[in-house]
């Protein structure tokens, strides 16, 4: 599926603030949550609905709800946690499945070190969240893991994506829809997105940077 770049004015504005070199941990963390929520709105626009009856103030009324099992949100640790609160603000009943993936800084390849999936995940929509889609190795490894667990409907939400990472995911998993706030220019020789956001994990958790 072609990657969907969500160019909503609010997303563009907030992402611009996130690109500042001197942004504080507090502001970066809050903006990651806000953009995560806005991406969630777009990524769930086609969810199926079903009708049911309730007793309203003036009698029985027919209303709608999302059909099927609850969604599971899958943050890729550790940086994916930074988007989790924003996603859950819109889908508070979602289950959370955590996947830990580490990238070798020399080979840029990923390996999985943690897997905590919710029950009946094969019947749920799995929404992967990670601020950065750089080489794509972490995302591909996570999708591999979810498909092995039986997931059939998988979507990915990232704040910023590199063309190289998009190509890697689309080649390995062409059935997975990617939603991103921005498709950036390229990767540098160290596997970082240009212009990107810097190290999103460090900025979310306040490591290796000065707090304002």
UniProtKB/Swiss-Prot annotation:
GO biological process, one term: UMP salvage
EC number per UniProt: 2.4.2.9
Ligand binding (5-phospho-alpha-D-ribose 1-diphosphate): 78, 103, 130-138, 199
Annotated residues for binding of uracil: 193, 198-200
Cofactor note: Binds 1 Mg(2+) ion per subunit. The magnesium is bound as Mg-PRPP.
EC primary class: transferase
Origin: domain of life: Bacteria
Pfam family, one: UPRTase
Its biological purpose: Catalyzes the conversion of uracil and 5-phospho-alpha-D-ribose 1-diphosphate (PRPP) to UMP and diphosphate.
Protein name in UniProt: Uracil phosphoribosyltransferase
């Amino acid at each position: 599926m072609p990657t969907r770049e969500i160019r909503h004015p609010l997303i563009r504005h907030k992402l611009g603030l996130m690109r500042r070199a001197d942004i504080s941990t507090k502001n970066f963390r809050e903006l990651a949550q806000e953009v995560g929520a806005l991406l969630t709105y777009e990524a769930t626009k086609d969810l199926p609905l079903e009708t049911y009856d309730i007793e309203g103030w003036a009698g029985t009324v027919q209303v709608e709800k999302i059909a099927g099992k609850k969604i599971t949100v899958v943050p890729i640790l550790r940086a994916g946690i930074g988007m989790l609160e924003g996603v859950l603000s819109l889908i508070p009943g979602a289950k959370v499945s955590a996947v830990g993936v580490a990238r070798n800084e020399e080979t840029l390849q990923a390996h999985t070190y943690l897997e905590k999936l919710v029950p009946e995940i094969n019947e749920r929509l799995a929404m992967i969240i990670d601020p950065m889609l750089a080489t794509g190795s972490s995302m591909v490894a996570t999708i591999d893991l979810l498909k092995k667990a039986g997931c059939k409907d998988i979507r990915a939400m990232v704040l910023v994506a590199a063309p190289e990472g998009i190509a890697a995911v689309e080649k390995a998993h062409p059935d997975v829809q990617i939603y991103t706030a921005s498709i950036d220019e390229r990767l540098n020789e160290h596997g970082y997105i240009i212009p990107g956001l810097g190290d999103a994990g460090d900025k979310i958790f306040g490591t290796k940077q000065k707090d304002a």
